Amino acid sequence: MNHQTVLVTGGAGYIGSHACLELLQAGFKVVVVDNLVNSKLESLARVQQLAGKALSFYQADIRDKQALTDIFAKEAPDTVIHFAGLKAVGESCALPQLYYHNNVYGTLVLTEVMSAANVKQLVFSSSATVYGESASPQYSEHFPLGAINPYGRSKAMIEDILRDLSASDRLNKVEKPWKIALLRYFNPIGAHDSGMIGEDPNGIPNNLMPYVAQVAIGKLAQLSVFGDDYPTRDGTGIRDYIHVVDLVQGHIKAIAALNAEHFAEGACKAYNLGAGRGYSVLEIIDAFQRITGKIIPYQMSPRRTGDLAECFANPALALAELNWQVEKDLDDMVNDTWNWQTKNPQGYQ
C-alpha cells in the first residue's frame, strides 16, 4: 500500500482527472487544486466513484499564494504533479499576457510555496510544443528548443525556471534539493474505458480527436483539414497521438523514478511521452469511420501558420529511465473516445 500524498494542480481537467484516477487506484492519497476555469467538478465525482476512494479537493488558483500555503500546511504532500495551465495555442496568440501570467507566474508561485514547505519533488506537464523546427520529424529530448507560439514559450520558460531551481540547489548544496521530471506530451487523446471521464472542451474543440467525435455525433457539421499538400504519405499533417491513460501512467512511473535512489539529487530531467510513431489527419478520420460506422464530412482548408508537416516522439529515454512505454493503439484511442462521446454527448453537463 502506498502512503504517499500527491498534490495535483489542475486535477479536474482532462489529463488531470485521468491521473487522479490512476493515482487513487495505485494507492496514493490525492489532493486536487483546481480553479475550475476550464474544468468541471463532476469529473472528480466520477473519478472517486470509479476508484471507490475519496480525494481532497480545493477550489483555488495556483497564483493565490496564501491559499496554496494553507493547503500545503494542511495536506503535507510528498510530490506535486503540475497540470494547471491554459493550453490553447490559438488563444495564446490572441492573449499572450493571460498565458504568461497564468502559466509562468502561476508556476513561480507554486514553486515558492513548495520551497517554503520543503516539498521538492515535482512532475511537470510540459509539451512537445517546446521544440523548434528540426531536420528530423522524430524529436529527441536533446533537440534544440524553439517554441513558436506563446503557449509553447510559456512551457519552455517554465522548463527553464525549473532547471534553474534544481541548478541553484546543487550550487548551494542544500540538504534536500529539487528532483524534477519534465514530461513533454505529444498529442493526448482517448478516454478512460468506462466512458465516465474524458475530454470535455469548452466551446469548439481545439484538438482533432474531440472535434472528429463531435462531427460524428452531429454536434458539429464538418471537419476542416488544414493542409493537404504537406510532404507526407497522404499530404496531411502527421502527429504522434498517445492514449491519455498511457500518458498518466507515465506520471506514475515518473513519481517512482523521483522516489528512487538512482534519480540524482538536484536533477531536472526531460522525457518525451509519445508513441514514437505518427498518424495523419486522414488516417485518424479513416480509423474513426471504420470503428464507429459514421461518416465524417470534411473539407480541405489552407495550411495553418506554424504547423509542421510531421512530428513524433523518440520515447526511448522514457523506456530506459522510467520503464514506460505506450500499451494502447489507435483503435483503443478511437474506441474510448467514441464510448465517452456517445455516453456523454453534452460532456459533463
Regions found by a protein language model. Name each.
Residues D193-I197, T236-G237:
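Short acidic, glycine/proline-rich loop/turn micro-motifs
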Residues A60, F72, Y99, H142, ...:
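Pocket-edge positions in alpha/beta enzyme catalytic cores
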Residues G190-H192, D229-Y230:
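Short, basic/glycine-rich phosphate-binding loops at helix/coil junctions
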Residues N172-E175, S194-G195, E261-E265:
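Short helix-coil transition/hinge motifs at the ends and kinks of transmembrane helices
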Residues Y100, I148-A156, G198, N202-N206, ...:
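Short-chain dehydrogenase/reductase
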Residues M1-A191:
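N-terminal Rossmann-like NAD(P)+-binding domain of SDR-like oxidoreductases, especially those catalyzing
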Residues L208-Q349:
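C-terminal substrate-binding subdomain of Rossmann-fold SDR/epimerase-dehydratase oxidoreductases
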